[in-house]
């Protein structure tokens, strides 16, 4: 099957699964019965009783925001302490020591913000207890927090002259119990059936099928002749005295499948293994790759249809979905085409395989041969369009233009589907901007879903839309003038700048993926990236809730012949233009110094 046909198939499967899931989520959040209600509703009610939650409470937007901040703050402190103390806690068969304070802060900020940036390798840094009780729990609740904030905004559109947006605690409970837990239970079982590990055994050491020789610098010696009896290594007839013979391999174990499932569906992205879903024990074959890849965008895509049903305007949900979907298709096409073509330099270095019957060719540097160009390119587009960040190939090895597209998808504010909940409420902020601009053009008061858009909503919408660019540009600008950051770059020149820009784009966009050549585990980078993640997560949440509170207090306006349609192709086009203009105007100078300079340098 050709690369493009595979990409089309992946997109088709995504749409087919997203529509029914969207209907299910709408029923759950509106309190309607579902096919799982008989089993899950008693569990939900028990949680309310134990935690003394008033399920009828209607919080103001400020109280809702305070609840979100307190809940996230408690999660930050708990996860921080859990990492510091893991060396003296149970569930640590490898006897791993506690994590350094700066890395613990970075990881805590990363996981409570749904970013899941990882400046460490999970299998060699964190205990099973920390992975399960710390990271996996945050994968669930950080995803649920984003969806809860989205539904607060939806209620703002629905309600009339009201100050209540529902209860954060009720929303959080329903999302976890009725949506995330059952969905991830099914996906976990599919992954285990496909070969992803799920156990509590300590790591194992196994014998290699064939020994290898490495130099003193740790590089594999090609064409080496190994004599195990005399323990000597010869290359081209000469003995390499400082070479080491490797006959065993460290194989990590642990509860990977359960964490992989929620890392994908919750757009978290933090891998159980250091190389994420490129690891054969985390993503062993084409079947698990399909499950994990579709899971990335499943809930973000479904929420578009949920939104349309909830506001009783399904065409509006479809319009928002189409704006996101068209951007994704174009981005995926650009990545797939440029990766399939490669570059002349990569061809000279032997990284571009020639097309033949057994394989499709293309830039295979940094990619797994079991996946190839199509699955790797599709995953790259999905994971950066969503604020997921998991990878099955190394983005640092992509061609300059493909790397720029992945970077731009994050820099747009993670609104091309984006994270669960946060992607859609971010896109709705852009929709408010688009409606305001269109209203100015025709000389009418801007309206959206029957509510007037006034200066108060505009100010907060601008803040929501600009939070990501501010976090990325300020963070990367400061890092560029700190001398120690240069030591973290694997490459110099334009590509080195791209590594740094990608890092801050990933953290500022709450994505978490990385150009693997960048070493982010330093005190300055751990602290600065942690602050960027917190800023880019919670400022838009506060802005979204402020907009929701204002809209809920307004009356509905009757639709007239002069009302701007927000469900037709023209509005979809306008929305895409607004998103791209803000992204282009904000980031073009930075992109010109990085991936664009590298691209033009490669063809000069």
Describe the predicted segments one by one.
Residues 1-106, 151, 158-162, 166, ...:
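N-terminal alpha-helical transmembrane segments of multi-pass membrane transport
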Residues 8-13, 69-73, 133-144, 153, ...:
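Hydrophobic alpha-helical transmembrane segments of multi-pass membrane proteins
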Residues 16-23, 75-80, 135-160, 294-313, ...:
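Transmembrane alpha-helical segments in integral membrane proteins
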Residues 68-82, 174-197, 296-299, 308, ...:
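Selective recognition of specific alpha-helical transmembrane segments in multi-pass small-molecule
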Residues 90-135, 198-294, 347-422, 486-535, ...:
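P-loop potassium selectivity filter motif centered on the GYG triad
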Residues 158-181, 302-326, 441-462, 555-568:
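Hydrophobic, small-residue-rich membrane helices and short re-entrant helix-turn-helix hairpins
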Residues 287-318, 325-326, 387-459, 535-536:
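Long hydrophobic segments that form regular secondary structure
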Residues 429-433, 438-442, 459-485, 489-490, ...:
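C-terminal catalytic subdomain
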